[in-house]
């Protein structure tokens, strides 16, 4: 700890009121500097150095001192973010430098044409139409590439380093003055760091991180208030509140990406240097950006971000390309209220509107009855969508979805399409409300809904063909028994024709019977029989997972296998014994005990054993902390000898948690070849990075042996 920090700590021990005026002024100045520094490390560097409780203590002390000494309070103090009295309306603001929109590109050809126009405008020899990167290295145009955030465009005006005005984009010429609201956003500095220009107008985006959006909606729902459709709507609605105290409670963030008016300093030579300058002044700047040359560089950036889009912590709807040299931007100029030097390359829309033509119910593996909206076909998220999940009856009531409604449908990545909201003003007069059936549409069994559950279930069990089909598909999946070639259509035929009723029946199948089925030939039938035969040798944890016990996923199956060692011991365990297993609580214990108490399930297990399904067994392991218990790992890149799944199994077997993204709570990142942004973030946060050898050495040091396969 430095002398400065030691002195500050000593002063902190004295009550605020006990400090004389000079000491209070000194302490207030130090507290503001510390809070600004912590905000910079958190919002700009994404590398917080103190826990939230310590930050809150510093903030509370500053607030107490300012109350005790009101003459020390200043507009740029961190305490002034809480929001003042409500406004009657927002004033209009005329932008000194217009906030122009960008032209859009939706296809590669649009990008090639953009690059060609830029090259020609700068007097360079352009390639022929439809060809990319035929320039020499010297002739290729250099571009700055960044993300196109799905939020609300904002202009921040700083004078002598202090925030004096914030305005929305509006029509590009005139926006709304939202300064009082923007001052509540912790990511936006009220005072810039270092030597700030006399006037600096920063353009950027106010948005909401997905994690913060989810928490906000959870709070809204808990309070019985309206939830938001998406983070963009939440950000826009929060920023345009007439009561800034409401805005202060909303988790808004900000990224800077452009420059308006500038006085007192020379403009930087390039757009990328400008962004680096913003970060040095304490403004948050997105790290997912690059400088590339030529059209191929632009397309490579677009594809790289497209692959990672669903893993980003915020919503984007495309990427933006800008000629990097500011002097070249000026040469290219503007056309039709848009810059010639910039282009927005859009991703396929993740939200679209369409019409609900019907609402049907599907029956899942555990009997769950899921309402599904049958939609008028719509292209969203890169595919044509005709169905969307409605989750459960309560969700339909909450969203007020009727047959005939126009709805907003969202599809992101591999996520199942869902209806996120109804466009109420477009509801037709003949719209029909959904009524949950009382009997299963597949087997006719009674549908029941327990008081403490949101999901209704068919009570038919394996009598229900729909549940049998889903159970067989689960049993055969790669992470369970790994029976390659057993897909939906084949399972449909096997169940509908009465050939297979339980998983054990799969091991009785022969080539002749399979080859007689639709779309099956001798070769594909032989391949499937071979895959079924191969699956006889498995592991205990895979077998447990394959059984489809409710609430038992892969991780719990591994814990059960390690704890009991033998399947018979697990089957004989009562709820009290099951509660001795790591991470098994009362609900899971009850579900497991109930499953093995069902005679039909025991009979199927014995049939599977009789069919030759086997696995190595071991002695029970007493409940004790695993060597890496409590540690969080993130895997990125390609490891030299282990697949990512193998590495994950080794770490989980040692008690570690394997997460999908890097945060300040991550203990280690294991990086292989072609590691991407996760490695960059780990290095920025100071998270230890291991290669495969380092991970194996850590496992060996912890006494964790590789899991048997």
UniProtKB/Swiss-Prot annotation:
Q: Name one GO cellular component term.
A: cytosol
* Residues that, per the record, bind NAD(+): 52-56, 101-102, 146, 169, 205, 322, 346
Binding residues annotated for Zn(2+), in chain numbering: 440, 443, 458, 464
Against Pfam families, the record matches this protein to: BRCT, DNA_ligase_aden, DNA_ligase_OB, DNA_ligase_ZBD, HHH_2, HHH_5, Nlig-Ia
Q: Where is the active site?
A: 148 (n6-amp-lysine intermediate)
Q: What is its EC number?
A: 6.5.1.2
**PROSITE patterns found in the cross-reference section:** BRCT (PS50172), DNA_LIGASE_N1 (PS01055), DNA_LIGASE_N2 (PS01056)
A Gene Ontology biological process in which this protein takes part is:
DNA replication
Role according to the record: DNA ligase that catalyzes the formation of phosphodiester linkages between 5'-phosphoryl and 3'-hydroxyl groups in double-stranded DNA using NAD as a coenzyme and as the energy source for the reaction. It is essential for DNA replication and repair of damaged DNA.
Family named by the database record: Belongs to the NAD-dependent DNA ligase family. LigA subfamily.
**Stated name of the protein:** DNA ligase
Q: Which organism's genome codes for this protein?
A: Cupriavidus taiwanensis (strain DSM 17343 / BCRC 17206 / CCUG 44338 / CIP 107171 / LMG 19424 / R1) (Ralstonia taiwanensis (strain LMG 19424))
- Gene encoding this polypeptide? ligA
